[in-house]
């Protein structure tokens, strides 16, 4: 069966049906949600730093703290607006810094803690106590701790959010199958930061963000808007530059993702990649625009459940063979496919076409200007013969 015979769903009718709705729904964010403002940003950044300097840190709450930091950069008002625009009923909890005194080994100690509904005073104090142990050890080893190794370095919060930027691109897979790729990428782009901080453990931090995004989907909307706002703001630190690169690459600015689907288990890459880079593909763009109107995870899962959209009209591409093979690989057609294909005709057509292109040597790897990392990912995905691949 030819790809050209596979028909799209009638998205226009669906769109008209949804547009005609006179009602909206309200989702709940839970009992209350902490909405920190700019004034506590420095303290939350320091909390992130305490986790980073702690050797073998427990990162159970790092995802949550990272999101609190992102919200403090957006500000309380914008955070609430983002949530309300996404259909959430928000009972906002203001966040302040207070002083807490506690007896530690017979000695009264003073701690500054945040008035959070989501993170108890006890947890915050434990994070600080553990970080103090590591800091004492650093003082013994280094004599004096340089500013970039300290817990109050201004980029601590953004270092943690770089891992969130990697995690968010993998959510549409519906599982944590992208964790290995997140760890590998984090080890590469944050290698300098890992030399600074012994508590920067990509696997543990990534799992913490997975947990937060899975349990609290409203944070996904907040993070996407934060990422766009952060990336569109000029200037900033080196780590802010890294974050913008990771975030914008993940959201479709990188054509390698579009062509190869190496990271296509995140449907968000395909969706925004096609819509922004290949606007001439009217049928595909129609579906993607429709999915964007659905918004949030609903739109991404719509595309996940309709993989045919990303495999149609591909003959219009200058390097259409590469794109077909890339999308086929990304959808699991050339790699591992989990579960039963939702559209057997599409699956068979795409698989046959992609295999034919591969066998006939139609794909010209050398014109794609791949980095060593991308080449490694493609080798892993497609297992080409060594002489097929040139850099």
From Swiss-Prot:
One GO location term (cellular component): helical viral capsid
Cross-referenced Pfam families: Pneumo_ncap
UniProt KW keywords: Capsid protein, Helical capsid protein, Host cytoplasm, Host-virus interaction, Inhibition of host innate immune response by virus, Inhibition of host interferon signaling pathway by virus, Inhibition of host MAVS by virus, Inhibition of host MDA5 by virus, Inhibition of host NF-kappa-B by virus, Inhibition of host PKR by virus, Inhibition of host RLR pathway by virus, Interferon antiviral system evasion, Phosphoprotein, Ribonucleoprotein, RNA-binding, Viral immunoevasion, Viral nucleoprotein, Virion
UniProt cross-references to InterPro entries, sorted A to Z: Pneumo_ncap (IPR004930)
Modified residues (Phosphotyrosine): 38
Impact noted for substituting residue 23 to D/F: 65% loss of transcription but no effect on replication
Region annotation Interaction with the phosphoprotein: where it falls in the sequence: 31-252, 244-290, 338-364
Effect of residue 132 to A: Almost complete loss of viral RNA synthesis
Main location: virion
Cell compartment(s), UniProt: Virion; Host cytoplasm
Biological process, per Gene Ontology: symbiont-mediated suppression of host cytoplasmic pattern recognition receptor signaling pathway via inhibition of MAVS activity; symbiont-mediated suppression of host cytoplasmic pattern recognition receptor signaling pathway via inhibition of MDA-5 activity; symbiont-mediated suppression of host NF-kappaB cascade; symbiont-mediated suppression of host PKR/eIFalpha signaling; symbiont-mediated suppression of host type I interferon-mediated signaling pathway
One Gene Ontology MF term: RNA binding
Processing after translation: Tyrosine phosphorylation modulates viral transcription and replication.
Family, similarity comment: Belongs to the paramyxoviruses nucleocapsid family.
Assembly description: Homomultimerizes to form the nucleocapsid. Binds to viral genomic RNA. Interacts (via N-terminus) with the phosphoprotein P (via C-terminus); the phosphorylated phosphoprotein P binds to N-RNA complex. When in a monomeric RNA-free form, interacts with the phosphoprotein (via N-terminus). Interacts with protein M2-1; this interaction allows the association of nucleocapsid with the matrix protein. Interacts with host EIF2AK2/PKR; this interaction inhibits EIF2AK2 phosphorylation of EIF2S1 and blocks EIF2AK2-mediated translation shutoff.
Summary of the function given for this chain in its UniProt record: Encapsidates the viral RNA genome by forming a left-handed helical nucleocapsid that protects the RNA from nucleases. RNA replication depends on the availability of soluble nucleoprotein. The encapsidated genomic RNA is termed the NC and serves as template for transcription and replication. Together with the phosphoprotein, sequesters host NF-kappa-B in inclusion bodies (IBs) thereby inhibiting this host defense pathway. May also act as a modulator of the innate immune response by sequestration of host IFIH1/MDA5 and MAVS into IBs.
The protein's name: Nucleoprotein
């Amino acid at each position: 069966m030819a790809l050209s015979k596979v028909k799209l769903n009638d998205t226009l009718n669906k769109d008209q049906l949804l547009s005609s709705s006179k009602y909206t729904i309200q989702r709940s964010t839970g009992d209350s949600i902490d909405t920190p403002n700019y004034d506590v940003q420095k303290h939350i950044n320091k909390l992130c730093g305490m986790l980073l300097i702690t050797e073998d840190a427990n990162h159970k709450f790092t995802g949550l703290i990272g999101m609190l930091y992102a919200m403090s950069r957006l500000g309380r008002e914008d955070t609430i607006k983002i949530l309300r625009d996404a259909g959430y009923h928000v009972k906002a909890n203001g966040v302040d810094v207070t002083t807490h005194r506690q007896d530690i080994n017979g000695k009264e100690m003073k701690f500054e803690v945040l008035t959070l509904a989501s993170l108890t005073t006890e947890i915050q104090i434990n994070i600080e106590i553990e970080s103090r142990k590591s800091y004492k050890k650093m003082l013994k080893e280094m004599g004096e701790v340089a500013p970039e190794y300290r817990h109050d370095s201004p980029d601590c919060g953004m270092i943690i959010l770089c891992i969130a930027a990697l995690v968010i691109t993998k959510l549409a897979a519906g599982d944590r199958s992208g964790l290995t790729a997140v760890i590998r990428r984090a080890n590469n782009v944050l290698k300098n930061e890992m030399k600074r901080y012994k508590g920067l453990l990509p696997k543990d931090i990534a799992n913490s963000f997975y947990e937060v995004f899975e349990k609290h989907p409203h944070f996904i909307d907040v993070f996407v808007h934060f990422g766009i706002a952060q990336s569109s703001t000029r200037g900033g630190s080196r780590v802010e530059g890294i974050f913008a690169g990771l975030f914008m690459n993940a959201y479709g600015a990188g054509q390698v993702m579009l062509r190869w689907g190496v990271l296509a288990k995140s449907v968000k890459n395909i969706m925004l990649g096609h819509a922004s880079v290949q606007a001439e593909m009217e049928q595909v763009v129609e579906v993607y625009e429709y999915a964007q109107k659905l918004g949030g995870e609903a739109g991404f899962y719509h595309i996940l459940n309709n993989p045919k959209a990303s495999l149609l009209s591909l003959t219009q591409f200058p390097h259409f063979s590469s794109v077909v093979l890339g999308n086929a690989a990304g959808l699991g057609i050339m790699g591992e496919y989990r579960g039963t294909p939702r559209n057997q005709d599409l699956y068979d057509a795409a698989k046959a076409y992609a295999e034919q292109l591969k066998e006939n040597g139609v794909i010209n790897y050398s014109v794609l200007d791949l980095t060593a990392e991308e080449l490694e990912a493609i080798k892993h995905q497609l297992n080409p013969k060594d002489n097929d691949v040139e850099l």
